[in-house]
Amino acid sequence: MVNDPPVPALLWAQEVGQVLAGRARRLLLQFGVLFCTILLLLWVSVFLYGSFYYSYMPTVSHLSPVHFYYRTDCDSSTTSLCSFPVANVSLTKGGRDRVLMYGQPYRVTLELELPESPVNQDLGMFLVTISCYTRGGRIISTSSRSVMLHYRSDLLQMLDTLVFSSLLLFGFAEQKQLLEVELYADYRENSYVPTTGAIIEIHSKRIQLYGAYLRIHAHFTGLRYLLYNFPMTCAFIGVASNFTFLSVIVLFSYMQWVWGGIWPRHRFSLQVNIRKRDNSRKEVQRRISAHQPGPEGQEESTPQSDVTEDGESPEDPSGTEGQLSEEEKPDQQPLSGEEELEPEASDGSGSWEDAALLTEANLPAPAPASASAPVLETLGSSEPAGGALRQRPTCSSS
């Protein structure tokens, strides 16, 4: 007896272990579901902010090389060109996506890379013209600017050559000037007439240049200015706002689905149950009226159903007469083609509401099995069986 193991203590420890293991599994499952939900909401928030940023922010800067061409069918003995250098620049990406966005102001500049040659120094001022066109080649905007090389004296050129001689010898520096010509300071795209390209022309036949680039830079204001100059701060605020909004929606949906604490359904379900009960009563009344045809010359009666709240049909009177109360039990009327022997209900002086309802105390004695068959046959036919009239039992008023 002394060496017997403590069985109740072991059982208690086993039960406690099972309970703790169940709680641990439940907590682990809840934590996993919560973590997956938070991760999904965070991913959706980042996706929404990225989609908004991509659709709302235009191209910040667009740099396109400018390739000039000119005629060569003139006399080659002269040093000047046969025509002005002209270039056609497309303002679409891949032939489909446009570079410019509607309503956004842009700064359009032309960068010219000119050598400091004696020809360019003697060139003086020259004119640069840009013509923007839309579909079909129709010109919609034109702008012209004058340009010239920056002046430097012979002494300054000599000193510059001496200082940067080592870099010039190894090719790390060149004797050239980069001119930036502002063609449009505030160019706005028209949504009805989009810009598809531009034609650039230099009005000089003696110009010498290394290359040229057309730069289009967006000038942001308002929200776009904040998104461009403070990208990390705006991204954090945008993702946090989306995450908060989605979390509130998910929380309200969870509360409504689990507890139903926001919009309770008790009143709505009660109304639905009452409507269903009324519909079932009407259906039973319709079926009873279908079993009682009214021939010509006979007095039509209004059958009423003995349906209770549980939906029992009048075909089983033994189960309904004891359950119906005086307020819910309908008045019993005689069948069509039968004569009533009760003067109080047929002479018009009284009403069916004045007659007392049947109760368990004054129910008539049940008829034998042999006598119930003619009654059933009478309910299914318009003529009484055997030519006998069924008398309605007189109910004593309480």
UniProtKB/Swiss-Prot annotation:
GO CC terms in record: endoplasmic reticulum membrane; lipid droplet
Cellular compartments annotated: Endoplasmic reticulum membrane; Lipid droplet
BP-aspect Gene Ontology terms: fat cell differentiation; lipid catabolic process; lipid droplet formation; lipid droplet organization; lipid storage; negative regulation of lipid catabolic process; positive regulation of cold-induced thermogenesis
Residues annotated as glycosylated: 88, 242
Effect ascribed to mutating residue 175 to A: Loss of oligomerization and function in lipid droplet formation
Keyword Acyltransferase assigned: no
Effect of residue 151 to A: Loss of oligomerization and function in lipid droplet biogenesis
Pfam (any one): Seipin
Membrane topology: Multi-pass membrane protein
Recorded superkingdom: Eukaryota
GO-annotated molecular function: phospholipid binding
Effect the entry attributes to changing residue 88 to S: In SPG17 and HMND13; does not affect protein subcellular location
Lumenal side: 48-242
This protein's UniProt keywords: Congenital generalized lipodystrophy, Diabetes mellitus, Disease variant, Endoplasmic reticulum, Glycoprotein, Hereditary spastic paraplegia, Lipid degradation, Lipid droplet, Lipid metabolism, Membrane, Neurodegeneration, Neuropathy, Phosphoprotein, Transmembrane, Transmembrane helix
Cytoplasmic-facing ranges: 1-26, 264-398
PANTHER family xrefs: BERNARDINELLI-SEIP CONGENITAL LIPODYSTROPHY 2 HOMOLOG BSCL2 PROTEIN, SEIPIN
Name listed for the protein in its UniProt record: Seipin
Organism in which the protein naturally occurs: Homo sapiens
The encoding gene: BSCL2
